[in-house]
Structure formats: C-alpha cells, structure tokens
C-alpha cells in the first residue's frame, strides 16, 4: 500500500514538473512572438520605468557637452605682441614679424619673434598664464593645430563609433553605454594631468571615441525604451542636460584660472557612469528581437513592479516569433533604400552640426562679453528644446525639420547684413542656433525611427561620420578670412537649403512602428500604423468593459430568477419540491 502511495506521489510530482516545464515553454514562446513597439506601449504611453530609463541615458548629454566645450575655455585665442628693445613690433598669428623693409625694424621682416635675436613674444591676455597653449608652448602655432584638441576628439569618434555600434547591435546597448561612459570619465581625469600636448591629444582622441560611442548608442536606446507617443519628450532631458553641461563648464571657468583645474573639475560628475551599471536595463526592443527571453522576463518583473501594473501582452503578439538576426555591413550595402536613408540623413546631420557648433564656439570669440555671449548661447537651448514637445505632437518629425532648416537658412543669410554690429549679429546667430537646436533634437529621433532594429546602432554610427565632419569643420569657421567676409555664411546657408530639400524627400515616422530588419523596409505592412493598434486597444478595452457590464447584469438576472425558483429543483425530468 505504501509502495502504491509513493508511486502515486512520484507520478504527481512528475506531472506537476511537466506542467511547469510546459508552462515555461509556452511563456517563452509567447515572449518570442512579442511585437516590440506594442510591448512598450502595453505599459502606457508614459510608463514610469520607461521614463526613468530614458532620463538615465539622456543625462549623459551633460557629460558629452562639458567634454566638448571645456576646450573653448582652456585654450582661448591669444592676443600677442612682439617686443624688441623696448619697442612693440606687429606680428602674425604664428609670430612672424610683419614690418616693411623700408621702415624701422625692416631687417626683421619675415623673422619669427622669439627666435630672432633680442625679440620676445608677450601675451597680453589677462589670464594667459592659465592657457593650455601657453603651458604646452603652442602660443605661435598655426590655428589648425591650436584647435586640434577638438578635432582629434571628433576623429576618435569617427573611427570608433561604427565598431562600437556593431557591438551594441550584437551584444546589447547597456554594456556599450556603461563601459564607454566609465572609460570616458577616467580618460578625462587623466587628461588634466597630461605632461605634454602629444599625451593630451591621445587622451582626447580616446575620450572622443568613448563619448560619441555612449551618446550614439544611448540615442538609439532611448527610442527603444520609450513608446512612440513619448518620444517627443526625449528632447526635454536631452536639451536641459546639454545646456546644463555648457553652463557647468562656464561656472567652473569662473571658479578657477588654472586650465588643469578647470578640466579636472568639469570632468568630476562623470563618475555617474558607474551608477548606470546598476540602474540601467537593457533595451526591450533588443531583447525581443534577439530572443533573450530570460533577460526579458527580468525586465518585465522590474517594469511591472515600478509601473505597478501587470500587462497580459495578449494584444502584443505577432503571428511568428523573431528570428535572431545579426545583419552585417554587407547586408546594409545590399539595400538601396537604406543607403539613400543614410545619405540624406547624414548630409542633414553634417549641416546642422556645422551650424550648431560653429555658432557655439564663435560665441566665445565673438567680441564683447564672452561669458555673457556663451551664457546666452547655452540657455537659449532650454526653451528651444521645450518647444519641440508640442511641435512634435502636432507636426510630427518631417515638417519640423523642413521648416527649421528653411528658417535657419534665412537667419544665416541675415547674419551677412549685420557682420559689423556685435548686438545684431549675436541676436541673429542665436536665432539660427535655436533652429539648429530644434533640428538637432528632432532629427536624431526621426532618423533612428527610419533605421531597422537589426542594424539601427550601425546605421546611426554611419550617420555619425558626416555629422562628425561638420563638428570637425565648426571650430575653424571663426578663423576663415575671405573677401567679401559674408561668403562663408552664404555657403553654409546653401547647404542648409539643400538639407531642407533632402528632408522633404524622406518619409514621416510619426505613428509608425520601428522597422525590425532591412527586409521590412521594403514591405510597408511590416511597419504599419501604430494608431490602428491604439484604436483596437481602446476599442477592446471598451468591449471588455461592456462585456463585464453584461456579465454583471446577467449575474443579477440569474440570481433574481434563482431566488424566485428556490422552492423548485429539477433532476432529470422529475420535479421535486423542497
């Protein structure tokens, strides 16, 4: 008898284990068939956990911004004069003596001050002793080399970001974002102790590679963390964090006159990167498309707890599960449509980065009060970023980019009229920067929504190359001397107008699902309207409410009929009275 009972118990245990395994298998299969966009929307348009993760990654703009703009304050342009036997001789930017041979000191014409006998270069800037250029003996170097701290930063980004983005597509967004953020912080700390300019440039290249990597992958991840409706809010933290990074740089500049201390203090908040490892989750889009069901379960568990909801995901299912795809650069080159998207979006990014950063860097050297000009240039971005929210909700992505590019073109042409007036020139350039800020906020979201999930980070990094070219060119705009002096502004305005034309030829992405792979770009049905899903979701919820009401009414009716007939019970064909 005991043997029989034991065998029954073992049988029950095996049966329950099989049921549990089958349940887990079914659960995993359901997770593999999830639609990524509908999955995110299941937590609502503004789920707490989704907003939290968006804030985490977009805060990184603070550190990127400060890493860029600190260079404007550690190597301000030098005002120099040459002293020769208690006399002052005019010199060029590279310290070449410029005198007429027929006049006094004509024998020194063409010589270099500091090298010619009895000559001495004297820097007249009040705080020149704190300047990186003076510290590394670069006072008389060509302006191309003086700006190389910014240039090498971007060159490092161009080289590294495509490779890091491919790793992000293959191994996930989180490890790349966190690792590069921490490495950028450590390299920034080390750069403030650089013994010479060569070491400083090597570290700046590494910082640029890491900084652009975390920012590029974070931009992609943000669109994957949030629902389509909430993506308009990306610009809030993005612009506020970026502007605060600029203001932080300015505040530190006012704290100390020593360039090394300026650089060190500005870099300190970068310790934030270590916190990301603990708090930042992996992108749900990436987890679903890569069939990482166990990690997705952990994400769901945390999201359910933070959002205080437990979605069923019944309306988020697709007919088939995702095949794990590792689409390569070769697959990208095989798609003409994707190449067109890369070209058009890349050109737009190049132009807006050129305009945006050129104005930002020129505000420090524009004349007048450089602190005030840079402060205006920093703070103007906050209202510009906030304006994006209603604009994106009302107009989508495409029309905002087109109109802002047109107004940016007109502003750049307007600058040429007031080149000799500091106040008017500053105001019109700030108008152009407002337009550039709005485009810079909207266009990365728009471009990200056009690229497939399987190669989204790779595409974003390739688009980053022309963008980086715009950044590389931007600090040199202030050094261009042409006759007439309005030509550079007209040329940039022409590029801006061409960008508006290219934007007109691209498609709107508002209310559209993110394409999952390269093939889905060729099939519109694969990227159908999300608004249809929202309508079906709302209608199903109303139907559900109606069905619940009908069930309650049926229960009421049945209970009333039962109460009336409680004295009669039927068994088969016979009636018995209680």
Curated annotation (Swiss-Prot):
It is found in: Membrane. InterPro entries: MFS_dom (IPR020846), MFS_sugar_transport-like (IPR005828), MFS_trans_sf (IPR036259), Sugar_transporter_CS (IPR005829). GO terms for molecular function: transmembrane transporter activity. It is a multi-pass membrane protein. Residues 1-30, 532-561 are annotated as: Disordered. Belongs to the major facilitator superfamily. Sugar transporter (TC 2.A.1.1) family. This is Putative transporter B0361.11. It comes from Caenorhabditis elegans.
